[in-house]
């Protein structure tokens, strides 16, 4: 957004989203708002005042007015929320690479059952702000571990591009290192650990269940890409996304597809999908469901009519509530 002093932009930074002012002269940007918070794109700049939505560990978002280098919070949407604290977590992958994330713990001493929650993208990030899913699961008694393995945004281009062409195997290394770091903090029950995620997070859930199933008691995969070959032809972004992330050689897509390795899955597996998902079409869920059921794996498929890829964020309130109920019911039965 242009202002008198430069262009305001938001930049992802280790789970935060900084608001920067880039001078027209091309000199180093100034940090307008930094620290462990997330900002949306600011509103139009008028009379020397810029308004931005800012979220942190206490609120999912407040409007903040920026004037003369100072901040004034205009709203109090999160004032009455009873949120559980977010703990920063740092781990180390076997190759020495740092892995960054967070834990949201339930109240009480534990030991608590654990959920490894994996974000989509993969070039997105979890962050410092209040996240409804982590809060719901932690409030129900589960310690939620979430982080930004290589392939995520917010840590530089090399971090984001690291997994290209070998997505499942390389992502799993960092995710398991993050889980190990969380378990080492104490108060968590490693024998009652589940894994879940949506979109790319669902891809990784299936991959981990197949290749590292001994680490988990059960899994939930949502709106996932499971078979790269059919995704390439059926997804609204398949023609470009597939080659950018999984490589130019279609012969390698089979080995990288979680569906290829589903014959190794033995743990209970819940698949959640939307019938009008054009990003990861419903056939991705159906193919995995059929393969697991034919092998006798305890598997359930929950389909939401009239919903798309964004069900968990912008679906009908009744469907979003039903989804949470199904997820908590599954963990209640298996963890």
Which residues does each predicted region cover?
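The conserved beta1-alpha1 loop
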Residues: 118-120, 273
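Active-site-proximal cap/loop segments of hydrolase catalytic domains
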Residues: 149-335
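Conserved hydrophobic/aromatic "anchor" residues
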Residues: 91, 112, 142, 216, ...
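Histidine-centered divalent metal-coordination motifs
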Residues: 100, 119, 309
């Amino acid at each position: 957004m242009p202002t008198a002093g430069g262009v305001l932009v938001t930049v992802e930074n280790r789970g935060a989203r900084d608001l920067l002012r880039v001078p027209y002269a091309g000199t180093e940007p100034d940090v307008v708002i930094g620290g462990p918070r997330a900002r949306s794109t600011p509103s139009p700049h008028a009379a020397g005042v810029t308004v931005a939505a800012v979220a942190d560990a206490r609120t999912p978002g407040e409007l903040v007015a920026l004037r003369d280098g100072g901040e004034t919070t205009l709203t109090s949407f999160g004032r009455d929320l009873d949120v559980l604290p977010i703990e920063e977590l740092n781990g180390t992958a076997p190759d020495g690479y740092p892995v960054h994330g967070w834990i949201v713990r339930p109240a009480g001493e534990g030991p608590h059952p654990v959920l490894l929650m994996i974000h989509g993208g993969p070039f997105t990030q979890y962050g410092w702000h209040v996240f409804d899913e982590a809060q719901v699961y932690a409030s129900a008694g589960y310690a939620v571990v979430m982080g930004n393995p290589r392939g995520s945004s917010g840590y530089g281009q090399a971090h984001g591009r690291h997994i290209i062409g070998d997505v499942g195997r390389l992502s799993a290394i960092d995710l398991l290192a993050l889980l190990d770091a969380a378990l080492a903090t104490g108060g968590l029950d490693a024998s009652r650990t589940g894994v879940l995620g949506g979109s790319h997070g669902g891809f990784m859930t299936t991959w981990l269940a197949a290749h590292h199933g001994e680490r988990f008691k059960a899994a939930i995969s949502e709106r996932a890409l499971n078979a790269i070959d059919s995704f390439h032809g059926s997804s609204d972004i398949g023609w470009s996304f597939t080659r950018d992330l999984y490589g130019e050689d279609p012969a390698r897509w089979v080995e990288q597809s979680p569906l290829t390795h589903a014959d190794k899955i033995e743990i209970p597996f819940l698949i959640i999908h939307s019938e009008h998902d054009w990003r990861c079409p419903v056939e991705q869920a159906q193919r995995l469901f059929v393969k697991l059921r034919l092998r006798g794996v305890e598997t359930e498929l929950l389909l939401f009519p009239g919903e798309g890829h964004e069900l968990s964020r912008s679906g009908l309130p009744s469907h979003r509530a039903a989804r949470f109920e199904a997820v908590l019911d599954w963990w209640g039965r298996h963890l």
